[in-house]
């Protein structure tokens, strides 16, 4: 089964790569920072409503510059880590998806988190994710030992772990 949606812009993956493709255009960095901020705010609003996406990867999030609107595609019902709330899963999956790209500036991820922090539930969600990550520290130590093999997902898992634990929640 499939469904068709109205045109809703290009993906975050597309926009995130524009500044590197056009290094002479200084306005692109500001535009992409804005897009990630808007996405973070949108995800936070979704979480404030008690909803979750299920797998918000960069390829499943679009931005329409004409309307300044984010659209989330390819929703999923299941989680693969039952200890995490659906909102915690969303946040961790997006951070992992972003860091999986490896060549993107961390500033866009911080812009996303700045937008996300406007949500009522943001602080509790971040604290929840940090608690679960700390509880499973040995898993991430093991993933870190695999870094010399350059497995994309385990490297991104370690980066996501480090990023989330370093976030200020005060």
Where are these regions (language model features)?
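Conserved hydrophobic alpha-helix
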Residues: 42-46
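Short, flexible loop/turn elements at secondary-structure junctions
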Residues: 9, 65, 76-77
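A short beta-strand motif that forms the metal-chelation/ATP-contact edge
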Residues: 4-7, 69-74
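Conserved protein kinase catalytic/activation segment
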Residues: 60-72
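Conserved structural core of kinase catalytic domains
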Residues: 1-35
